[in-house]
Curated annotation (Swiss-Prot):
Protein name, entry field: UPF0398 protein BcerKBAB4_1482
Family from the record: Belongs to the UPF0398 family.
Family annotation (PANTHER family): UPF0398 PROTEIN SPR0331, UPF0398 PROTEIN YPSA
Species for this entry: Bacillus mycoides (strain KBAB4) (Bacillus weihenstephanensis)
Pfam families referenced in this protein's UniProt entry, alphabetically: YpsA
InterPro entries linked: YspA (IPR010697)
Lineage, broadest ranks: Bacteria, Bacillati, Bacillota, Bacilli, Bacillales
């Protein structure tokens, strides 16, 4: 596996409204564990669309992993131009920081937002250009990742394409592990 697409929930879908929320570190730890294993098995690129939440947190994790594995690269393929234009200023600054550190940036449709079709094109692009999908996603709470997860599963039925999931139960295990470690 050379290229993995990473996605997951937007912050509000998780009840997270600031990047210093304890849940963010928990999600990043889960992503770090999975991505480190993938890198040790030959992963070269992580691709994201730059969506707030899991995707940008994954970008931060990639930057951390790059210290030990400098050959790992991050690509941001936005579904449309200027996706951040209606975001709050602090979110825009955070997004621009991530873009400034990315190894590759491009827009899939090369135009500003016009219709939801651009999100469908983004999902198709990500599934076509990656060898696997890593999603912070639990079918019990579908949310925004639902459509790309469905596309990945469909591709997996006809080709050698894998989907890896970080479930709410995985995050709960990490939180309990942290509480246990902090109690010692």
């Amino acid at each position: 596996m050379k290229v993995v697409a990473v996605t997951g929930y937007k912050p509000f879908e998780l009840g997270i409204f600031k990047n210093d929320h304890p849940g963010v570190e928990c999600i990043k730890k889960a992503l770090r564990r999975k991505l480190t294993v993938f890198v040790e098995e030959g992963l070269e690129w992580v691709i994201i669309s730059g969506q707030l939440g899991v995707e940008l947190w994954a970008a931060e994790v990639v930057f951390e992993i790059q210290v030990e594995y400098p050959n790992l690269k991050l690509a941001v393929f936005t579904p449309f131009l200027e996706q951040e234009e209606n975001w709050k200023e602090d979110n825009r600054e955070y997004y621009e920081f991530i873009l400034s550190q990315a190894d590759h940036i491009d827009s899939i449709t090369k135009r500003k937002y016009e219709s939801p079709e651009q999100f469908k094109l983004k999902n198709q692009f990500f599934i076509e250009k990656s060898d696997a999908l890593l999603a912070v996603y639990d079918e019990e709470k579908s949310g925004s990742p639902k459509y790309i997860v469905e596309a990945a599963k469909k591709k997996g039925e006809i080709e050698n394409y894998h989907s890896y999931f970080i479930l709410f139960s995985d995050l709960q295990d990490i939180m309990e592990e942290e509480q246990w470690n902090n109690a010692e």
